[in-house]
Amino acid sequence: MVNIRPDEISSIIRQQIEKYDQDVEVANIGTVLQVGDGIARVYGLDEVMAGELLEFEDKTIGVALNLESDNVGVVLMGDGRDILEGSSVKGTGRIAQIPVGDAFLGRVVDPLARPIDDKGEPASNGTRLIESMAPGIIGRQSVCEPMQTGITAIDSMIPIGRGQRELIIGDRQTGKTAVALDTIINQKGQDVVCVYVAIGQKASSVAQVVSSLQDKGALDYTIIVAANADSPATLQYIAPYTGAALAEYFMYKGKATLVIYDDLTKQAQAYRQMSLLLRRPPGREAYPGDVFYLHSRLLERAAKLNAELGGGSMTALPIIETQAGDVSAYIPTNVISITDGQIFLSGDLFNSGIRPAINVGISVSRVGSAAQIKAMKQVAGKLKLELAQFAELEAFSQFASDLDKATQNQLARGQRLREILKQAQNSPIPVEEQTAIIYTGINGYLDDIEVSKVAEFIRELREDLKNSKPEFGENVRSTKKLEPVSEELLKRAIEDVKQGFDKA
C-alpha cells in the first residue's frame, strides 16, 4: 500500500492556493422587463448613472435616461428587434463620447461619429464627451470678428459675428438651408471649420447637400453629421450635441468654427417622442418640461473664447421650421429667446420672387453689428432706413392714386434697393463687392436704370471692379474702410459701366 504523506499533500495544496490568481470582474447587470418603440425598461442596474451607456446582449447600445425606484428607462440607439424580454443588460460605466480629430474634415458621419460615406474609419486624436460643459463667463470675450455669409442682405443689415448664435427661422421651403449652405461656401479660404448637422432629413436631401458642397470645394473644411429620418429618435436627439463636440475640438485649438443645426424642430420632436414613451409628464404642445434646457445647453456651447483659451470661436446657426409663419409657437419662442438674433424668412416674399426671402423688418442681430467692418457700417445704416421707409410707403401707396414726385422717387429707389439684395443660390458675394453694390444703390446711381436692368448693371459693375480696378477690393480688404481713394475708384467704375450700358 502506498504511503500517503500528509505534509506532501498539504504543500501541493498550499502551492495551488498560492498560484491561484483569479481576476474578479464586477459587472453592473440588469434584466430587460419590457422593450418596444425604441424604449427598454430594465430591472436591476442599481449603480447606473444618468446618461450612462448600456450594452444589451445583441450589442445594441442604449442610454439610461429615467432612473426610477424599481426600474431604469433606457432609450435605444438601434431598432432593438433582437432584444428579448428577460435578457441581460450590462452597464459600461461610460457616458456617451465620440472620437474627434482633424481626419473628420470632409467626412459624413452618424451621431456616434461612425463614418457613413464608405471612405473607411477616420483616424481620431482622442475622444470628447457628447454633452460637455459650455465655456464659463470668464472664458469668453465679446463678439468682435465678422462671420461673413456672402449674402448681401444679411451681411449689411443682420450682420453675424464669430461666436454668435443666430437663428434662421421660417416655414418649410423658404430657403433656410440655402442660407446656411451659402454661409459654409463663403468660408472658403477663411480658415473656418464648418459642421453641418442634418436632423431627421431625407437621405436624398443630405446627399444633395454633400454634392453641392463638393462642387463648390467646400467639403474639405466641413464635417457632416447626419441623423436621417429613418434613424432612431435617440440618434436624432444626440446629433446636435455630436456636431457641437466635433466643433469644440477645433474651437479649443484656437480655430474659428461654424455649426449649422438643420433643424432643431426635428430634434425637439424626437425628444418629445422619447419623453412621452418614457412616461414623463407632457407640458405645452405635449413637449416635456425640460425642452428649453434641451436647446439652451446646446446653444450655450457657442462662444468666442478669450486669448488665454486660444481665442477660438464657435458660431451657431440653428434652424427652426415654423407652421404658417407662427413664430409664437413653443419651440420658436424658446429658441428666439436663447439666440442673439434671428433671420426670418417669409413664404410670401419667397413666392413673390424675392430671394433670399429675408423679412428685414422682424429680422435682427443683437451683437453682430459690433463685428461689422467699417466699410459696411458706412453704407449699411442708410440702407436699412431707406428700406424701412420704402416698406411703409409701399403699403400706403396701394390705397393712394396720385403721389407727389418725392414719394414716387422714394418708391422707385426702394424698388431698386430691393433688387440689389436679390441673390442667386450658391453664389456668395465678397464683402468689398457688397459694399460697392449698396453704395451704388443708396447714392442714387441706379435711379435712372430700369428696375428689370438693375441686376445686369450690378453684374457688369462687379466685373469691372474685379478686372479693371482690382485695387478697390484690395484697399477695402486691407483697410476695412471705404476711404476717399476707394470711393473715387468706385465712382469711376460706375461711370465707366454706365457709358456702355443700355439703361432702358
Curated annotation (Swiss-Prot):
InterPro entries: ATP_synth_asu-like_sf (IPR023366), ATP_synth_asu_C (IPR000793), ATP_synth_asu_C_sf (IPR038376), ATP_synth_F1_a_nt-bd_dom (IPR033732), ATP_synth_F1_asu (IPR005294), ATPase_a/bsu_AS (IPR020003), ATPase_F1/V1/A1_a/bsu_N (IPR004100), ATPase_F1/V1/A1_a/bsu_N_sf (IPR036121). One of its GO terms (molecular function) is ADP binding. It catalyses: ATP + H2O + 4 H(+)(in) = ADP + phosphate + 5 H(+)(out). Keywords: ATP synthesis, ATP-binding, CF(1), Chloroplast, Hydrogen ion transport, Ion transport, Membrane, Nucleotide-binding, Plastid, Thylakoid, Translocase, Transport. GO terms for cellular component: chloroplast thylakoid membrane; proton-transporting ATP synthase complex. It is found in: Plastid, Chloroplast thylakoid membrane. Pfam families: ATP-synt_ab, ATP-synt_ab_C, ATP-synt_ab_N. Its EC number is 7.1.2.2. Its main location: plastid. CDD domains: ATP-synt_F1_alpha_C, ATP-synt_F1_alpha_N, F1-ATPase_alpha_CD. HAMAP family: ATP_synth_alpha_bact (MF_01346). The gene is atpA. PANTHER family: ATP SYNTHASE SUBUNIT ALPHA, MITOCHONDRIAL. This is ATP synthase subunit alpha, chloroplastic. Produces ATP from ADP in the presence of a proton gradient across the membrane. The alpha chain is a regulatory subunit. It comes from the Eukaryota. It is a peripheral membrane protein. The record marks 363 as: Required for activity. Belongs to the ATPase alpha/beta chains family. ATP binds at residues 170-177. F-type ATPases have 2 components, CF(1) - the catalytic core - and CF(0) - the membrane proton channel. CF(1) has five subunits: alpha(3), beta(3), gamma(1), delta(1), epsilon(1). CF(0) has four main subunits: a, b, b' and c.
